[in-house]
Structures are given as structure tokens and as C-alpha cells.
């Protein structure tokens, strides 16, 4: 708990510098100085420097989304409405749009791209796990791939949405979720079409052999909280 507290302290000190210097080593060093932290301790808390705090910032948003969602009445909502709500709460959990804009550029760099993809995958996994997804086959992957794409596209749209209420972003999100639902309807029609299902028996059999990973903390999206 003490370690997490010190990381949060360092992250809070770094955010004002991120606006001007991005998620950089300079911002990290400024934050260390601002909280009068020993550089050796800072290196232990964040061995990779700025990228570790950028990761912590993203995960902080995930944690806040989960906290707010769990206190929101959702029993009467359809699955698509729950997904929409979760993505919206995730965006509303972000207190600093400029920090996210800088993070988007930071994680777009080739050396950071894999970490950025892992974070988005983790957000999608948190949402599906929170919604009670029990998939044990290829659907475990397809749901998270699809939601990762929806979330990533919505974040980029949100960054360019200057409307204070972000109405355009929520409309964009609704359209993306609708697109996903249409794909699911199409998949259902394929399964219901006996001649087509028979023609695809081979590929479907192979897909059926794909299983969801067993819980492991070192896999994308499989954090201890999952």
C-alpha cells in the first residue's frame, strides 16, 4: 500500500509537467524533485521512469471506472448499454485530456506501442470481466479485440471533441457499438443457416479449439484484479 501511495504521489506531481514536456524523462525528474524524493527510491518505484508512470496513469483510470460502475444501478440495462456505460465512465474517469493526448502520442512511438496496446487490451478485459463474461473459447479473444478497437477509436474522437458535454463523442460511441452489434447479428445468422454452417464446419471446428487463457498475471489484461 505504501508503494502504491508513493507512486500515486509521484504521478500527481508529474501530471502538471506532462502538459508541457509530455511523458518524458524530464517530466519524471521534475516530479521526483517536486516531491523531494530520493532518485534511488524513484528508480525503485518506477524502474523505466516516465513509461511506468504513464502506465500507472492509465491503470488509475481503469480502477476509477470499475469503482464507479460497481456503484451504478445496471440491472435493467441491456449488454450493449452496459458496454456503452463502461466506456463512457472510463473516459469520464480521465481528469486531464491533455495528459491523455500526450499519452496517445507517447504510446504511438514504436518502442512504446506494445505497452500501449497491452493497456487498451487490459481496459477491454476489465470491462468484459466486470460484465461477467464467461467465454472460454475464441469469443474471449474476439470480444476483447472488438472492444479494444471501439475504445481506442472513441478515445481518439474524444480528444478532438471540443463540446463541453462531449455529446458528439457519445453519439460516436453509440454508432461504434451499433456496428459491433450488427456483426454479432450477422454471426448469429451464419450459425442459424444450416447449409452455410455445414460449409464452414472445418473452420468452425478449428475456432472451437481455441480456448480462453487460464488466469495468469503476466498476460495482457490478466491483472490481479481480474
Predicted regions, residues:
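Amphipathic alpha-helical segments used for helix-helix packing
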Residues: 93-114, 118
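Long, charge-rich low-complexity segments
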Residues: 186-226
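Hydrophobic/aromatic-rich alpha-helical bundle segments in the mid-to-C-terminal region
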Residues: 133-148, 152-195
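Amphipathic alpha-helical packing segments from all-alpha helical-bundle domains
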Residues: 111-133, 141-148, 152
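Short, amphipathic alpha-helix enriched in basic
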Residues: 2-40, 48-55, 59
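C-terminal ligand-sensing/allosteric alpha-helical core of TetR-family HTH transcriptional regulators
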Residues: 79-93, 119, 123-130, 176
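Hydrophobic alpha-helical connector segments
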Residues: 68-102
